Swiss-Prot record:
Family: In the N-terminal section; belongs to the terpene synthase family. In the C-terminal section; belongs to the FPP/GGPP synthase family.
Function description: Bifunctional terpene synthase; part of the gene cluster that mediates the biosynthesis of the diterpene methyl phomopsenonate. At first, the universal precursor of diterpene, geranylgeranyl diphosphate (GGPP) is provided and is cyclized by the unusual bifunctional terpene synthase PaPS to give phomopsene. The C-terminal prenyltransferase domain of PaPS catalyzes formation of GGPP, whereas the N-terminal terpene cyclase domain catalyzes the cyclization of GGPP to phomopsene.
UniProt binding sites for Mg(2+) 3: D486, D490
Residues given in the record as Mg(2+) 1 binding sites: D94, D98
Gene: PaPS
UniProt lineage: Eukaryota, Fungi, Dikarya, Ascomycota, Pezizomycotina
Binding site residues for substrate: D94, D98, R181, I182, V183, D184, N226, S230, W231, E232, K233, E234, R319, Y320
EC number: 4.2.3.-, 2.5.1.29
Species of provenance: Phomopsis amygdali
Protein name: Phomopsene synthase
Length: 728
């Protein structure tokens, strides 16, 4: 997985109690968004429903980690606010159900389930139900506006989760309890919320295995860990209500085996560790599961943070631990809203002077409605059709658009505040602006070919997982940078069926972001700690630029068409360069005693990939949807198909074709009629047949090279499967 929105926490800085060994802890870079959304939901609850449930202290928030930020660290930034808002809503619902009597709890579930199914009619609902219904309807409206397809899936799974009978207290034994608990821990809800948060599409044929089998250990481990962490809270409620049974694994083992609390906890945590170890094994194998879609594999990988994130949030959350408290800034934000810059400075100073300490009572007091946050107005905690408006400048359905602040208090601030003028210790600039174009193109659907190639080559090279991920991230950063630059240089308007980056952010910002991506790629390579890897990166990157220069030169000087040999040299540098860089870097970091020479294999693959792309551009209906009808003709690209047509067509047709390609300069593109004329000349010269024959020849050569390598280093099923996907 390419991590774009989160950073990893140094494992030496926290104690995971052996409950997530082999799984890192990551935190979303925009964790403040979750805090804002959580406080907004709690304000909306007070306004529309009434006082918060007595057990609702903390919710998403924690003194060290916020729940969504660590369980969904790769949530898209433009969806983090609504996802966090939903998560807090679910926490409050759980609190209501936990403290309600059986009949009332079932009624609450029915209210929510009906609201999700039909959309609550708030004019007929009363009291508490009406308020919850209003918030729920706003949530449904918001997620549907952002992503209607995944929103429908979210609602379906959320309803499925609520269908679980929440009043069940009696189980045959611990195993019977676990079958119930895996669903009761909101696995259906969290599965769907995760796919929505990361904009993943899981094919129907993958769902049973991915949702039910592969990730089952995740929900088992999370449920058991939660049972231990929440024991004190649940036991207090149990004793307060004079109950005779409770839904908790610790209690189940105590009853079944007549053991004490501490022994039951010890056994529960032991079982949790077993489930974690099982899932770590799944993670080690998932990259080779090319029978699953890329999104399915990404989903499975992302679910590891449901284990580590849930654990580390749960260790310190005030929700479970009454001796824990939120930090002072969270206290202030809950009590006073989100002040502007000057108010933050004053408030922080006041808090430091008073030594304010967080108490449970602070959270149950009324909180002022949040009116402004960094210059953005809010309503029901959410503003903007597709996500965040004004928070760190993020706004938009498919990317990030920076909004200028309109707070009049800033006018003349520099001239009024001499201390600020002379202050050389200002906070650094946010990278949100420069990363926005790259984040946008990274969010578009991708086949993940380069990741698949890396996973396949690792069968032979056995690159350690950490270093393999760093190499893959560097390659993906370079690939996305090249796509942004290519689209600017070619004047493309579509990329993967969406507007190209420069048509959203403008050429200047796009070029700047692409350069930043290249620097980030270099930083990833530097982390490998190898001078050889830096040399490989530099050498292959230079080839990429040289190859692109020839392609651009031929387009600009369209009378100077290249030879077939020149074309192949360009492809080897431009397209083959990334594949070659990938193979060389992986070879340099291989832990195998001997490594294959992959030069010919990846070189042939690079040629095949480029020629296939050119061929599909002229013949594939899918490419027409993703990039436009025969877009290469608009760009004036000299593909092998066009070069053959110019040399094989009768002179009058060849001259006509050349004039069409030159004439595209007038409007920057060809009309549909002109493209059809060009296609008729290309087809008349049998250039498409020629291209198909070249592809077939290359494919056979790749297979021969693969078989030769397999004879020395073993069978490589993932590479064969990848080839079958690319075969024309």
């Amino acid at each position: 997985m390419e991590y774009r929105y989160s950073y990893v926490i140094d494992p030496s800085s926290y104690d995971n109690q052996g409950l997530c060994n082999g799984i890192p802890l990551r935190v979303h870079r925009n964790a403040d968004i979750e805090e804002y959304a959580t406080i907004s939901l709690r304000n909306d609850w007070r306004k529309h429903v009434g006082p918060l449930p007595l057990t609702s202290y903390g919710g998403n928030l924690g003194p060290k980690y916020n729940f969504t930020a660590v369980t969904l660290p790769e949530c898209r930034p433009d969806r983090l606010e609504i996802v966090s808002y939903i998560m807090e809503f679910a926490f409050l619902h759980d609190d209501l159900v936990d403290t309600a009597q059986v009949d009332e709890a079932l009624a609450l579930n029915d209210t929510w389930r009906d609201g999700i199914t039909e959309g609550l009619d708030t004019t007929s609902a009363k009291g508490k139900k009406s308020g919850e219904g209003l918030i729920l309807r706003n949530i449904l409206k918001e997620v549907t506006a952002i992503d209607p397809v995944r929103a429908a899936e979210l609602m379906k799974f959320w309803k499925r989760d609520l269908d679980v009978s929440r009043d069940r207290k009696h189980f045959r034994d611990f195993d019977d309890y676990m079958e119930y608990r895996i669903v009761d821990c909101a696995s259906y809800f969290l599965i769907a919320l995760s796919t929505f948060a990361m904009a993943l599409t899981i094919p129907a044929e993958d769902k049973d295995e991915v949702f039910t089998l592969l990730t089952r250990p995740v929900w088992a481990a999370a449920a058991l860990t939660n049972d231990v962490q929440s024991w004190e809270k649940e036991d207090k409620l149990f004793q307060k209500d004079n109950a005779t049974d409770m839904t908790n694994g610790v209690w189940m083992l105590m009853k079944q085996y007549s053991i004490g609390v501490e022994e039951a906890k010890r056994r529960i945590l032991g079982k949790a560790r077993e489930h974690v170890a099982e899932f770590v094994k799944t993670l080690s194998q998932i990259h080779n599961r090319l029978d699953l879609s890329l999104d399915s594999r990404l989903f499975v990988e992302a679910m590891q943070y449901m284990i580590s994130g849930n654990l580390m949030w749960g260790i310190s959350t005030p929700r479970y631990h009454s001796d824990q408290s939120l930090d002072e800034m969270m206290v202030a934000r809950m009590k006073y809203g989100w002040p502007n810059h000057r108010e933050v400075t004053k408030l922080t100073s006041d808090l430091e002077n008073r030594g304010t300490k967080r108490t449970h009572q602070d959270d149950t007091e009324g909180v002022q409605s949040v009116k402004r946050f960094n210059g953005a107005s809010t309503k029901n905690g959410i503003n903007g059709t597709n996500g965040i408006n004004g928070l760190n400048g993020i706004n938009g359905s498919n990317g990030v658009k920076i909004k200028r602040h309109k707070n009049k208090e800033y006018s003349g601030a520099l001239t009024k505040d001499s201390d600020l003028v002379l202050n050389m210790d200002l906070n650094g600039l946010s990278s949100a602006i420069i990363c926005a174009p790259a984040d946008y193109i990274g969010s578009l659907p991708s086949k993940g070919i380069r990741d698949n190639v890396a996973d396949a080559l690792s069968i032979w090279l056995d690159v350690p997982a950490k270093e393999l991920n760093q190499i893959k991230r560097a390659i993906n950063l370079l690939h996305n940078a090249s796509l942004m630059l290519d689209d600017v240089q070619d004047g493309s308007v579509l990329r993967r069926a969406q507007p190209t980056t420069h048509t959203v952010f403008g050429p200047a910002q796009t070029i700047n972001s692409a350069g930043h991506q290249i620097i980030q790629a270099m930083n990833e390579i530097r982390k490998l700690g190898s001078d050889d890897c830096l040399d490989i990166f530099s050498e292959e990157l230079e080839k990429l630029y040289v190859g692109q220069s020839h392609d651009l030169y031929w387009v600009y000087n369209d009378s100077c068409s290249p030879t077939i040999e020149d074309y192949f040299k360009m492809v080897d540098y431009k397209t083959g360069g990334l594949f070659n860089m990938l193979a060389r870097l992986m070879t340099a970091k291989s832990s195998s005693s001997s490594s294959p020479d992959l030069t010919a294999l990846v070189g042939l693959l690079g040629r095949y990939f480029q020629i296939r792309d050119d061929y599909m551009n002229l013949t594939s209906a899918d490419y027409t949807v993703e990039k436009g009808f025969c877009e290469d003709l608009d760009e004036g690209k000299f593909s092998i198909t066009l070069l053959h047509a110019l040399s094989a067509a009768p002179e009058p047709e060849a001259l006509l074709l050349r004039n069409l390609m030159s004439g595209r300069r007038n409007d920057g593109k060809l009309s549909v009629v002109q493209k059809n004329l060009a296609l008729s000349i290309i087809e008349g010269a049998r250039s498409l047949e020629y291209t198909a024959a070249v592809l077939q020849k290359l494919y056979k050569a790749i297979v021969r090279e693969l078989e030769s390598t397999e004879r020395q280093f073993g069978e490589n099923k993932p590479f064969r499967f990848l080839l079958s996907l690319l075969k024309v």
